[in-house]
Curated annotation (Swiss-Prot):
The chain crosses the membrane at residues 14-34, 50-72, 81-101, 112-132. This is Transmembrane protein 203. Homodimer. Interacts with ATP2A2, ITPR3 and STIM1. Interacts with STING1 (via transmembrane domain). It is a multi-pass membrane protein. Residues 1-51 are annotated as: Interaction with STING1. Residues 52-136 are annotated as: Required for the lysosomal localization of the STING-TMEM203 complex. The keyword GTP-binding does not apply. One of its GO terms (biological process) is intracellular calcium ion homeostasis. CDD domains: TMEM203. GO terms for cellular component: endoplasmic reticulum; endoplasmic reticulum membrane; endoplasmic reticulum-Golgi intermediate compartment; lysosomal membrane. Disulfide bonds: none annotated. It comes from Homo sapiens.
């Protein structure tokens, strides 16, 4: 089942522009991942492969800050704080997952097991389920 753009904006709490930025980052990441796995670019590290995701997170955080400040100035204080809290929580959990996965791939450490790496995603899924129930 596919979701409409309106439903995605409602459930994720991101603006359409932010979703576009993250999809563009996913496209660039996919190309870099294919280049890294095939070995076509010898000096490409895992940290360089994940740069599009890190950049998208940074741009999304910047955009969210601007939107929250504008909402706060317009008198929508409650909406501004809730939006800022929600988006920063989602981006923080996503960022922690990306950092842990990148560290595991780059260093092959035994201390990082995949249950620990994916735990931010499980927390994020629980939060999205709660938000989906609240929205509908």
């Amino acid at each position: 089942m596919l979701f409409s753009l309106r439903e995605l904006v409602q459930w994720l709490g991101f603006a359409t522009f932010e979703i576009f930025v993250h999809l563009l980052a996913l496209l660039v990441f996919s190309v870099l991942l294919a280049l890294r796995v095939d070995g076509l670019v010898p000096g490409l590290s895992w940290w360089n492969v994940f740069v599009p995701f890190f950049a998208a997170d940074g741009l999304s955080t910047y955009f969210t800050t601007i939107v929250s400040v504008r909402l706060f100035q317009d008198g929508e204080k409650r909406l501004a704080v809730l939006r800022l809290f929600w988006v920063l929580t989602v981006l923080s959990l996503k960022f922690v997952f990306e950092m842990l996965l990148c560290q595991k791939l780059a260093e092959q450490t035994r201390e990082l097991w995949f249950g620990l790496i994916t735990s931010p995603l499980f927390i994020l899924l629980q939060l999205l389920m709660i938000r989906a129930c609240r929205v509908n």
